[in-house]
Amino acid sequence: MYQRWESSTRYYVIHVDVDLLGDLTLRRVWGGLGSPRGNQKTECLTPGQVEARVEQLAKQRRRRGYVRIM
């Protein structure tokens, strides 16, 4: 799964993948548009937790003025 949100100056991306051990990982990447600065954070979650966490993050992005691009 890949989701991307943007505001006028910032971006926020979520990747959900399976790692080499078979665990689900949720990686969040964020930063400024046109800027090399940014950061990322990785979380290991169960399948049930992934859906809830993605929805929680999407709700936060919308509340903060981001628009979903992908």
Language-model features: where?
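Negatively charged, low-complexity tracts enriched in Asp/Glu with abundant Ser/Thr
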Residues: 1-8, 35-36, 47
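Alpha-helical structural elements
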Residues: 6-7, 25, 61
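Generic alpha-helical secondary structure signal
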Residues: 6, 15-16, 48, 70
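Short aromatic-glycine-(Arg/Gly/Cys) micro-motifs in beta-strand/loop hairpins
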Residues: 15-41, 55-56
